[in-house]
Amino acid sequence: MKRILSFLGLILSLFLLLSACGQTTDTDGLPNKIIIKVQEFGEIYAELYPEEAPITVANFKKLVNEQYYDGLTFHRIIKNFMIQGGKGTKVDSIKGEFSANGIQNDLKHLRGTLSMARATDYNSASAQFFICQRAYAYGDGYYAAFGKVTSGMEVVDRIASVETDSSDAPLTPVIIESITFVYGA
């Protein structure tokens, strides 16, 4: 009997240890870490923060899981500000998760922050997102920050340096090959 209890204790300990080392996920079972692969530029690694922006993260993860972003572009680029991507077919809008819209979100728009783009309507965000190349204090409280680049800011900087037209569209398309989840990291 002692051997059985010892064995069960060992199994339980191993299970708890392995659980603690695993990738952080939401209740959806999908990881909160992603890779944005940008054709001819490289990879941007980011972590998503569902504790701060659960609706936004769930929406973004749903679109990533559906491969919505694959083949789209960073269609709006403003050097020393941000790169914006995800303009595609219309998807449903979500509630904006920021203080001006009555929702607490303490994430700041610092260099590397991922945030949702939107129109003037606070609840008009859907699929378009931007990555801050520089801190953007005005975004705090007015745009739904939901993640942060953990590696690959040099890629963001290279993208932010491409030549653009008068409406901030790149002269040569900057293509998002894919956005995928990082499993087991």
Predicted regions and their residues:
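N-terminal secretory signal peptides that target proteins for export/translocation
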Residues: 1-2
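Cyclophilin-like peptidyl-prolyl cis-trans isomerases
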Residues: 5-9, 13-185
